[in-house]
């Protein structure tokens, strides 16, 4: 299975840099087997059945991009340098792994000042990353980070514009609960309270799970034989209550439809024993054509990058030829792509 099998031409002007407003006004491509229909996200209840269950990732994106000043003492006095930090994940001991630009200007033992309230000591430089320990913890850290940090927009948006205050709302789901992600579960960005109420009135139920989306979600596949690709790991949890809800829906003949690839990867990780069960830990599950789905009966997701692991995932669900047709339709009909773009509802035949 070659990487080139998952390539397609995408006009640059189809990459969305702002989301649709209101959220549920984004377009929705519905693929049911070989049939393709054009719709709008707010019409999602029309495409689902009473008894269907949507699985929602309730991770909260932290404002993980920080700009600070490195302090260094020298014989000539204090020497400073501007440092850009992207937080990656917290360690068990309370420190944070982070990307730093330029990393070469940091040494162990130095301090980076981000604001009057927030600073971090450089504890180590390892594997191209900085290990930072902040001066604050808990709610105090969260509050200072909210003031000093910016949302970690995906690289294909950040290349076109800087993050701003609007992104702190736009790049967060309405049900975000557990802080820890450095990228949003973007299919979920299309939902607002009005749509959730309409779905509930239609008999659709919801289950919340947590997967903290990491920066590794944007890493390119660098091998031509995609089966040899090694996925990044992300922490997730499926509670006993969530597993029971999903199992009950399956037993009753309802469909389990994750909203977003993160929710899908998590519930399939929790079902490797054959059926859904409570689960917590790091998952590096890699879903590509030939994968045996145990839980997901469909998927709501945005449109993904060429040659990406997420394009491989949807190809596993729908079939490679079907996805080629779906994406050709999306490009021809000028759907907006990637994190702030339009959505698709994928229901295998």
Swiss-Prot record:
MF GO annotations: S-adenosylmethionine:tRNA ribosyltransferase-isomerase activity
Give the top-level enzyme category.
transferase
Taken from the UniProt entry, a GO cellular component term is: cytoplasm
Its predominant location is cytoplasm
> What Gene3D superfamilies does the entry give?
QueA-like (3.40.1780.10)
- InterPro entries cross-referenced by the UniProt entry: QueA (IPR003699), QueA_dom1 (IPR042118), QueA_dom2 (IPR042119), QueA_sf (IPR036100)
Keyword list (alphabetical) reads: Cytoplasm, Queuosine biosynthesis, S-adenosyl-L-methionine, Transferase
Tell me the route in metabolism or biology where this protein functions: tRNA modification; tRNA-queuosine biosynthesis
Q: Which subcellular locations apply to this protein?
A: Cytoplasm
**Catalytic reaction equation(s):** 7-aminomethyl-7-carbaguanosine(34) in tRNA + S-adenosyl-L-methionine = epoxyqueuosine(34) in tRNA + adenine + L-methionine + 2 H(+)
Give the E.C. number(s). 2.4.99.17
Q: Which Gene Ontology terms describe the biological processes this protein takes part in?
A: queuosine biosynthetic process; tRNA wobble guanine modification
Q: What family does the database annotate?
A: Belongs to the QueA family.
List, alphabetically, the HAMAP family matched: QueA (MF_00113)
- Its job: Transfers and isomerizes the ribose moiety from AdoMet to the 7-aminomethyl group of 7-deazaguanine (preQ1-tRNA) to give epoxyqueuosine (oQ-tRNA).
How is the subunit organization of this protein annotated in UniProt?
Answer: Monomer.
What protein name is recorded for this chain? S-adenosylmethionine:tRNA ribosyltransferase-isomerase
What gene, per UniProt, encodes this protein? queA
């Amino acid at each position: 299975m070659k990487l080139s099998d998952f390539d397609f031409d995408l006009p640059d002007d189809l990459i969305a840099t702002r989301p649709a407003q209101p959220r549920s006004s984004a377009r929705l491509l519905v693929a049911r087997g070989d049939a393709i229909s054009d719709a709008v996200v707010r019409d999602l209840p029309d495409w689902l059945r009473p008894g269907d269950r949507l699985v929602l990732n309730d991770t909260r994106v932290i404002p993980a991009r920080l700009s600070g000043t490195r302090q260094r003492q020298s014989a000539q006095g204090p020497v400073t340098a501007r440092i850009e930090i992207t937080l990656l994940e917290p360690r068990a001991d309370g420190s944070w792994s982070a990307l730093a630009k330029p990393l070469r200007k940091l040494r162990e033992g130095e301090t980076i000042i981000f604001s009057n309230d927030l600073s971090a000591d450089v504890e180590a430089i390892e594997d191209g990353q900085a290990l930072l320990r902040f001066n604050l913890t808990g709610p105090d850290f969260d509050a200072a980070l909210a003031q000093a940090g910016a949302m970690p927009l995906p690289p294909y948006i950040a290349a076109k514009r800087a993050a701003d205050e609007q992104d702190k709302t736009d790049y967060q789901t309405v049900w975000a609960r557990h802080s820890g992600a450095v990228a949003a579960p973007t299919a979920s960005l299309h939902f607002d309270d009005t749509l959730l109420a309409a779905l509930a009135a239609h008999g659709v139920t919801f289950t919340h799970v947590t997967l903290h989306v990491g920066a590794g979600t944007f890493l390119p596949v660098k091998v031509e034989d995609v089966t040899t690709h090694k996925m990044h790991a992300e922490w997730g949890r499926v509670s006993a209550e969530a597993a029971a809800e999903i199992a009950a829906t399956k037993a009753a003949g309802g469909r389990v439809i994750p909203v977003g690839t993160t929710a899908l990867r998590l519930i399939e990780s929790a079902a490797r024993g054959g059926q859904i069960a409570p689960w917590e830990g790091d998952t590096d599950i890699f879903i590509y054509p030939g994968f045996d789905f145990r839980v997901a009966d469909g998927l709501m997701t945005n449109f993904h990058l060429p040659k990406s692991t997420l394009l491989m995932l949807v190809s596993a669900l729908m079939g490679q030829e079907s996805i080629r047709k779906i994406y050709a339709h999306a490009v021809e009909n000028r759907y907006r792509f990637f994190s702030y773009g339009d959505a698709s509802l994928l229901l295998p035949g």
